[in-house]
Amino acid sequence: VFLSTNAQIKILFDATKAEMAGNADWVIDADEFNLRTNSNSTVTIGGRESNPQRFPTPDQSNITSTTPENFWTGGISGWAIDLVKHGYFVETLPYDGRITYNDSTNPQDLSNYKVFIICEPNSPFSSTEKSALINFVSNGGGLFMVANHSGADRNADNWDAPQIYNDFFNNNSIKTNPFGINFNYENITSKTANVINDSNNVILNGPYGKVSQVDYYNGTTMVLDKSANPNTKGLVYESNADNTSSNNVRFATSIYGIGKVCAVGDSSIPDDGTGDPGDTLYDGYFFNAVGNHRILLLNAVIWLATSSGLATDDIMKPELSVNIYPNPSSDYVYVQSKTSEKYHLTLMDSSGKVLQSIPNTDKISITSYPKGIYYLVIKNDKGFKNFKVEKK
Protein backbone atom coordinates (compact mmCIF):
# COMPACT_ATOMS: atom_id res chain seq x y z
CA VAL A 1 0.00 0.00 0.00
CA PHE A 2 1.53 3.33 -1.03
CA LEU A 3 -0.15 6.70 -1.28
CA SER A 4 1.73 9.43 -3.13
CA THR A 5 -0.71 12.14 -2.03
CA ASN A 6 0.46 14.99 0.16
CA ALA A 7 -0.18 13.79 3.70
CA GLN A 8 -2.63 15.79 5.81
CA ILE A 9 -2.93 13.38 8.72
CA LYS A 10 -0.13 13.87 11.24
CA ILE A 11 1.24 11.18 13.54
CA LEU A 12 3.29 12.26 16.58
CA PHE A 13 5.83 10.00 18.31
CA ASP A 14 6.66 10.85 21.92
CA ALA A 15 10.27 11.28 23.10
CA THR A 16 9.61 13.22 26.32
CA LYS A 17 9.50 10.19 28.62
CA ALA A 18 13.06 8.85 28.24
CA GLU A 19 12.07 6.45 25.45
CA MET A 20 15.75 6.37 24.48
CA ALA A 21 17.00 5.29 27.93
CA GLY A 22 19.37 2.37 28.41
CA ASN A 23 19.30 -0.20 25.63
CA ALA A 24 16.01 1.16 24.27
CA ASP A 25 15.89 3.44 21.25
CA TRP A 26 12.19 3.93 20.70
CA VAL A 27 12.56 6.98 18.48
CA ILE A 28 12.00 7.44 14.74
CA ASP A 29 15.17 9.41 13.94
CA ALA A 30 18.06 11.13 15.69
CA ASP A 31 20.88 13.19 14.21
CA GLU A 32 22.65 13.57 17.56
CA PHE A 33 23.42 11.18 20.41
CA ASN A 34 23.98 13.46 23.38
CA LEU A 35 21.13 12.90 25.84
CA ARG A 36 21.41 11.67 29.40
CA THR A 37 18.41 10.00 31.09
CA ASN A 38 18.52 10.61 34.83
CA SER A 39 17.24 8.75 37.88
CA ASN A 40 15.11 11.77 38.86
CA SER A 41 13.02 11.19 35.69
CA THR A 42 14.60 14.11 33.80
CA VAL A 43 16.41 14.05 30.46
CA THR A 44 19.32 16.42 29.91
CA ILE A 45 22.14 17.12 27.49
CA GLY A 46 25.43 15.47 28.40
CA GLY A 47 25.10 11.78 27.63
CA ARG A 48 25.20 9.38 24.68
CA GLU A 49 21.55 8.53 24.06
CA SER A 50 19.58 9.42 20.92
CA ASN A 51 18.33 13.00 20.76
CA PRO A 52 15.49 12.90 18.21
CA GLN A 53 14.56 16.19 16.58
CA ARG A 54 11.02 17.25 15.65
CA PHE A 55 11.37 16.58 11.93
CA PRO A 56 13.28 13.44 10.87
CA THR A 57 16.04 13.81 8.29
CA PRO A 58 16.46 13.31 5.40
CA ASP A 59 13.10 14.95 4.75
CA GLN A 60 10.17 12.54 4.53
CA SER A 61 9.17 13.98 1.15
CA ASN A 62 12.05 11.92 -0.23
CA ILE A 63 10.53 8.62 0.91
CA THR A 64 9.28 6.32 -1.84
CA SER A 65 7.74 2.84 -1.83
CA THR A 66 11.24 1.31 -1.86
CA THR A 67 12.86 3.42 0.89
CA PRO A 68 14.56 1.14 3.50
CA GLU A 69 13.99 1.50 7.25
CA ASN A 70 17.56 2.71 7.86
CA PHE A 71 16.80 5.85 5.84
CA TRP A 72 16.32 7.25 9.36
CA THR A 73 18.30 6.37 12.50
CA GLY A 74 15.95 5.14 15.20
CA GLY A 75 14.82 1.87 16.74
CA ILE A 76 11.28 2.37 15.43
CA SER A 77 12.13 4.14 12.17
CA GLY A 78 10.72 1.24 10.15
CA TRP A 79 7.26 1.84 11.59
CA ALA A 80 7.44 5.58 10.92
CA ILE A 81 8.73 5.18 7.37
CA ASP A 82 5.92 2.74 6.60
CA LEU A 83 3.41 5.31 7.88
CA VAL A 84 4.90 7.92 5.55
CA LYS A 85 4.61 5.44 2.68
CA HIS A 86 0.93 5.11 3.55
CA GLY A 87 0.49 8.86 3.17
CA TYR A 88 0.81 10.14 6.74
CA PHE A 89 3.14 12.87 8.02
CA VAL A 90 5.24 11.93 11.06
CA GLU A 91 6.95 14.02 13.73
CA THR A 92 8.72 13.54 17.05
CA LEU A 93 7.83 15.37 20.26
CA PRO A 94 11.44 15.99 21.41
CA TYR A 95 12.77 15.32 24.91
CA ASP A 96 12.07 18.93 25.95
CA GLY A 97 8.64 19.11 24.28
CA ARG A 98 5.35 19.52 26.11
CA ILE A 99 2.35 17.16 26.17
CA THR A 100 -0.63 19.54 26.04
CA TYR A 101 -4.11 19.70 24.55
CA ASN A 102 -5.66 22.93 23.26
CA ASP A 103 -2.67 25.02 24.32
CA SER A 104 -2.15 27.60 21.58
CA THR A 105 1.33 28.43 22.90
CA ASN A 106 2.58 24.93 22.05
CA PRO A 107 3.32 24.41 18.32
CA GLN A 108 3.19 20.65 18.92
CA ASP A 109 -0.04 20.65 20.89
CA LEU A 110 -1.86 17.33 20.52
CA SER A 111 -4.81 19.08 18.84
CA ASN A 112 -2.57 19.37 15.77
CA TYR A 113 -2.22 15.58 15.40
CA LYS A 114 -4.52 12.65 14.72
CA VAL A 115 -2.47 9.93 16.47
CA PHE A 116 -0.02 10.09 19.39
CA ILE A 117 2.30 7.10 19.85
CA ILE A 118 4.05 6.48 23.18
CA CYS A 119 6.51 3.60 23.02
CA GLU A 120 7.61 2.42 26.47
CA PRO A 121 7.68 5.55 28.63
CA ASN A 122 10.32 5.48 31.36
CA SER A 123 9.13 8.52 33.33
CA PRO A 124 5.64 9.16 34.75
CA PHE A 125 3.11 11.61 33.35
CA SER A 126 2.26 14.76 35.28
CA SER A 127 -1.31 15.56 36.26
CA THR A 128 -1.65 18.09 33.43
CA GLU A 129 -0.18 15.63 30.92
CA LYS A 130 -2.67 12.96 31.98
CA SER A 131 -5.55 15.38 31.45
CA ALA A 132 -4.18 16.40 28.06
CA LEU A 133 -3.98 12.76 26.92
CA ILE A 134 -7.51 11.94 28.07
CA ASN A 135 -8.98 15.08 26.50
CA PHE A 136 -7.08 14.38 23.28
CA VAL A 137 -8.71 10.96 23.01
CA SER A 138 -12.13 12.15 24.16
CA ASN A 139 -12.21 14.71 21.37
CA GLY A 140 -11.27 12.32 18.58
CA GLY A 141 -7.55 11.60 18.91
CA GLY A 142 -5.94 8.20 18.59
CA LEU A 143 -3.55 7.08 21.35
CA PHE A 144 -1.18 4.12 20.87
CA MET A 145 0.41 2.89 24.11
CA VAL A 146 3.30 0.43 23.98
CA ALA A 147 4.43 -1.00 27.33
CA ASN A 148 7.12 -3.51 28.30
CA HIS A 149 7.74 -6.14 30.94
CA SER A 150 7.70 -5.45 34.66
CA GLY A 151 11.04 -4.26 36.02
CA ALA A 152 12.22 -2.62 32.79
CA ASP A 153 13.22 0.56 34.62
CA ARG A 154 15.78 1.79 32.11
CA ASN A 155 16.55 5.14 33.76
CA ALA A 156 16.60 3.89 37.38
CA ASP A 157 13.82 6.24 38.55
CA ASN A 158 11.77 3.40 40.10
CA TRP A 159 9.15 3.58 37.34
CA ASP A 160 8.63 1.02 34.57
CA ALA A 161 6.15 1.27 31.71
CA PRO A 162 3.33 -0.82 33.26
CA GLN A 163 3.51 1.26 36.45
CA ILE A 164 3.55 4.51 34.46
CA TYR A 165 0.51 3.60 32.38
CA ASN A 166 -1.46 2.28 35.35
CA ASP A 167 -0.70 5.47 37.27
CA PHE A 168 -1.99 7.43 34.27
CA PHE A 169 -5.17 5.35 34.11
CA ASN A 170 -6.00 5.29 37.81
CA ASN A 171 -4.61 8.56 39.19
CA ASN A 172 -5.93 11.34 36.99
CA SER A 173 -8.38 14.18 37.61
CA ILE A 174 -10.88 13.25 34.89
CA LYS A 175 -11.98 9.61 35.09
CA THR A 176 -10.63 6.50 36.79
CA ASN A 177 -9.49 3.99 34.18
CA PRO A 178 -11.06 5.86 31.25
CA PHE A 179 -10.04 3.25 28.67
CA GLY A 180 -10.86 0.15 30.74
CA ILE A 181 -7.29 -1.19 30.53
CA ASN A 182 -4.64 -2.04 33.13
CA PHE A 183 -1.24 -3.59 32.53
CA ASN A 184 -0.13 -6.59 34.56
CA TYR A 185 3.32 -6.83 36.17
CA GLU A 186 4.79 -9.77 34.25
CA ASN A 187 7.77 -10.81 32.16
CA ILE A 188 6.63 -13.12 29.36
CA THR A 189 8.55 -14.59 26.43
CA SER A 190 6.40 -16.75 24.16
CA LYS A 191 4.55 -16.85 20.87
CA THR A 192 0.80 -16.90 20.42
CA ALA A 193 -1.65 -17.45 17.59
CA ASN A 194 -4.63 -16.83 19.89
CA VAL A 195 -6.18 -14.05 17.81
CA ILE A 196 -9.92 -13.49 18.07
CA ASN A 197 -12.03 -14.56 15.10
CA ASP A 198 -13.47 -11.31 13.78
CA SER A 199 -13.32 -10.83 10.02
CA ASN A 200 -14.78 -7.33 10.37
CA ASN A 201 -12.05 -6.05 12.68
CA VAL A 202 -9.89 -3.72 10.58
CA ILE A 203 -6.85 -4.14 12.84
CA LEU A 204 -6.81 -7.92 12.51
CA ASN A 205 -8.01 -7.89 8.89
CA GLY A 206 -6.94 -4.56 7.46
CA PRO A 207 -5.20 -2.85 4.55
CA TYR A 208 -1.85 -4.50 5.32
CA GLY A 209 -3.18 -8.01 5.76
CA LYS A 210 -4.41 -10.51 8.33
CA VAL A 211 -2.84 -10.84 11.79
CA SER A 212 -2.30 -14.46 12.82
CA GLN A 213 0.56 -14.35 15.36
CA VAL A 214 2.06 -12.05 18.01
CA ASP A 215 5.37 -12.85 19.71
CA TYR A 216 6.49 -11.52 23.09
CA TYR A 217 10.16 -11.25 23.98
CA ASN A 218 9.88 -10.06 27.59
CA GLY A 219 6.47 -8.41 27.63
CA THR A 220 3.39 -8.14 29.80
CA THR A 221 -0.33 -8.71 29.39
CA MET A 222 -3.36 -6.59 30.22
CA VAL A 223 -6.58 -7.03 32.14
CA LEU A 224 -9.69 -5.31 30.81
CA ASP A 225 -12.35 -3.60 32.93
CA LYS A 226 -15.61 -3.34 31.01
CA SER A 227 -17.31 -1.78 34.02
CA ALA A 228 -14.94 1.18 33.61
CA ASN A 229 -15.31 1.28 29.81
CA PRO A 230 -17.62 -1.19 28.01
CA ASN A 231 -15.86 -0.49 24.71
CA THR A 232 -12.55 -2.04 25.70
CA LYS A 233 -11.76 -5.16 23.66
CA GLY A 234 -9.05 -7.80 23.57
CA LEU A 235 -7.82 -8.78 20.11
CA VAL A 236 -4.83 -11.02 20.90
CA TYR A 237 -4.47 -13.29 23.95
CA GLU A 238 -2.00 -15.62 25.60
CA SER A 239 -1.83 -19.03 23.89
CA ASN A 240 -3.99 -21.00 26.31
CA ALA A 241 -6.27 -18.16 27.41
CA ASP A 242 -9.99 -17.77 26.83
CA ASN A 243 -10.09 -15.13 24.10
CA THR A 244 -13.53 -13.98 25.17
CA SER A 245 -12.34 -13.09 28.67
CA SER A 246 -10.89 -9.90 30.14
CA ASN A 247 -7.58 -11.45 31.21
CA ASN A 248 -4.28 -12.43 29.55
CA VAL A 249 -4.66 -9.86 26.78
CA ARG A 250 -1.64 -9.06 24.58
CA PHE A 251 -3.25 -6.44 22.34
CA ALA A 252 -6.27 -4.35 23.30
CA THR A 253 -8.35 -1.51 21.92
CA SER A 254 -10.82 0.91 23.42
CA ILE A 255 -13.03 3.84 22.49
CA TYR A 256 -13.42 6.85 24.76
CA GLY A 257 -15.52 9.82 23.70
CA ILE A 258 -15.00 9.99 19.95
CA GLY A 259 -11.37 8.87 20.12
CA LYS A 260 -9.63 5.52 20.12
CA VAL A 261 -6.89 3.70 21.99
CA CYS A 262 -4.58 0.78 21.18
CA ALA A 263 -2.37 -0.92 23.75
CA VAL A 264 0.28 -3.65 23.52
CA GLY A 265 2.55 -5.03 26.23
CA ASP A 266 5.95 -5.46 24.56
CA SER A 267 8.26 -2.85 23.04
CA SER A 268 10.12 -5.50 21.04
CA ILE A 269 7.18 -5.56 18.62
CA PRO A 270 7.97 -2.20 16.90
CA ASP A 271 11.78 -2.60 17.26
CA ASP A 272 13.22 -2.71 13.73
CA GLY A 273 16.71 -3.79 14.81
CA THR A 274 18.68 -0.67 13.85
CA GLY A 275 19.13 2.72 15.48
CA ASP A 276 21.44 4.17 18.13
CA PRO A 277 24.87 2.63 17.38
CA GLY A 278 25.47 2.39 21.13
CA ASP A 279 22.47 0.07 21.66
CA THR A 280 21.91 -3.60 20.85
CA LEU A 281 18.59 -3.79 19.03
CA TYR A 282 16.61 -6.75 17.66
CA ASP A 283 14.28 -6.90 14.68
CA GLY A 284 10.81 -7.55 16.06
CA TYR A 285 8.98 -5.40 13.52
CA PHE A 286 9.90 -7.09 10.24
CA PHE A 287 11.32 -10.45 11.34
CA ASN A 288 9.55 -11.74 14.45
CA ALA A 289 6.12 -13.38 14.12
CA VAL A 290 6.78 -13.89 10.39
CA GLY A 291 6.03 -10.23 9.66
CA ASN A 292 2.76 -10.14 11.61
CA HIS A 293 3.95 -7.34 13.91
CA ARG A 294 4.29 -4.92 11.00
CA ILE A 295 0.79 -5.81 9.81
CA LEU A 296 -0.63 -5.36 13.31
CA LEU A 297 0.98 -1.97 13.97
CA LEU A 298 0.15 -0.45 10.59
CA ASN A 299 -3.45 -1.63 10.60
CA ALA A 300 -3.77 -0.31 14.16
CA VAL A 301 -2.55 3.19 13.32
CA ILE A 302 -4.93 3.36 10.36
CA TRP A 303 -7.77 2.42 12.72
CA LEU A 304 -6.65 5.05 15.24
CA ALA A 305 -6.51 7.69 12.50
CA THR A 306 -10.10 6.91 11.50
CA SER A 307 -12.67 8.77 13.60
CA SER A 308 -15.33 6.78 15.45
CA GLY A 309 -18.40 6.35 13.27
CA LEU A 310 -16.31 6.49 10.09
CA ALA A 311 -14.96 3.91 7.68
CA THR A 312 -11.18 3.70 7.20
CA ASP A 313 -11.31 5.64 3.93
CA ASP A 314 -13.51 8.43 5.34
CA ILE A 315 -10.61 9.97 7.26
CA MET A 316 -8.89 10.97 4.00
CA LYS A 317 -11.92 13.12 3.07
CA PRO A 318 -12.14 16.85 3.90
CA GLU A 319 -14.07 18.32 6.82
CA LEU A 320 -17.64 19.23 5.89
CA SER A 321 -18.75 22.86 6.02
CA VAL A 322 -21.66 22.24 8.38
CA ASN A 323 -22.75 23.23 11.87
CA ILE A 324 -25.39 22.08 14.34
CA TYR A 325 -28.17 23.85 16.26
CA PRO A 326 -29.38 24.23 18.93
CA ASN A 327 -26.51 23.25 21.20
CA PRO A 328 -27.22 22.73 24.08
CA SER A 329 -30.54 21.08 23.24
CA SER A 330 -33.27 19.24 25.11
CA ASP A 331 -34.90 17.44 22.18
CA TYR A 332 -33.59 17.63 18.59
CA VAL A 333 -30.25 18.60 17.08
CA TYR A 334 -30.32 19.83 13.47
CA VAL A 335 -27.62 20.01 10.79
CA GLN A 336 -27.07 23.52 9.46
CA SER A 337 -25.57 23.79 5.97
CA LYS A 338 -25.73 25.92 2.84
CA THR A 339 -27.29 23.07 0.87
CA SER A 340 -30.31 20.83 1.26
CA GLU A 341 -28.17 17.69 1.49
CA LYS A 342 -28.93 14.83 3.85
CA TYR A 343 -26.28 13.17 5.98
CA HIS A 344 -25.48 10.03 7.93
CA LEU A 345 -25.62 10.95 11.62
CA THR A 346 -24.01 8.87 14.36
CA LEU A 347 -24.66 9.75 18.01
CA MET A 348 -22.39 8.38 20.74
CA ASP A 349 -22.26 8.71 24.51
CA SER A 350 -19.20 9.92 26.43
CA SER A 351 -17.64 6.44 26.39
CA GLY A 352 -17.95 6.18 22.60
CA LYS A 353 -20.89 3.76 22.59
CA VAL A 354 -23.03 4.23 19.48
CA LEU A 355 -26.57 5.22 20.50
CA GLN A 356 -28.01 5.97 17.06
CA SER A 357 -26.80 5.68 13.47
CA ILE A 358 -29.26 7.22 11.01
CA PRO A 359 -28.74 7.59 7.23
CA ASN A 360 -30.25 10.23 4.94
CA THR A 361 -31.31 12.79 7.54
CA ASP A 362 -30.56 16.29 8.80
CA LYS A 363 -31.72 15.92 12.41
CA ILE A 364 -31.44 13.56 15.36
CA SER A 365 -33.45 13.24 18.57
CA ILE A 366 -31.76 13.27 21.97
CA THR A 367 -35.04 13.52 23.89
CA SER A 368 -34.79 10.14 25.60
CA TYR A 369 -31.24 10.55 26.89
CA PRO A 370 -30.19 11.94 30.28
CA LYS A 371 -28.48 15.30 30.64
CA GLY A 372 -24.80 15.25 29.74
CA ILE A 373 -22.26 15.34 26.93
CA TYR A 374 -22.69 13.37 23.70
CA TYR A 375 -20.77 13.20 20.42
CA LEU A 376 -22.23 13.53 16.94
CA VAL A 377 -20.49 12.48 13.71
CA ILE A 378 -21.92 13.96 10.52
CA LYS A 379 -20.78 12.42 7.25
CA ASN A 380 -21.62 11.89 3.60
CA ASP A 381 -19.64 10.86 0.54
CA LYS A 382 -17.90 14.26 0.49
CA GLY A 383 -16.51 14.34 4.03
CA PHE A 384 -17.30 14.42 7.73
CA LYS A 385 -17.32 16.58 10.85
CA ASN A 386 -17.43 15.81 14.58
CA PHE A 387 -19.38 17.75 17.22
CA LYS A 388 -19.73 17.69 20.98
CA VAL A 389 -23.43 17.98 21.94
CA GLU A 390 -24.78 18.99 25.34
CA LYS A 391 -28.18 17.59 26.43
CA LYS A 392 -29.76 20.05 28.84
What are these regions (language model features)?
Residues 2-8, 305-320:
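Low-complexity, Pro/Thr/Ser/Gly/Ala-rich linker/spacer regions in secreted
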Residues 4-112, 298-305:
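Aromatic-Pro/Gly-enriched surface loop or interdomain linker
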Residues 14-17, 93-97, 118-122, 146-151, ...:
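Active-site-proximal beta-strand/loop segments in catalytic clefts of secreted hydrolases
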Residues 19, 27, 71-77, 257, ...:
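A conserved amphipathic helix/loop scaffold
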Residues 23-28, 59-70, 152-162, 274-288:
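Short, flexible/disordered intra-domain loops and linkers
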Residues 64-166, 171:
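Helical hinge/lid and interdomain linker segments adjacent to catalytic or ligand-binding clefts
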Residues 149-256:
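An acidic, glycine-rich "communication" segment
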Residues 315-392:
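C-terminal outer-membrane/trafficking sorting elements
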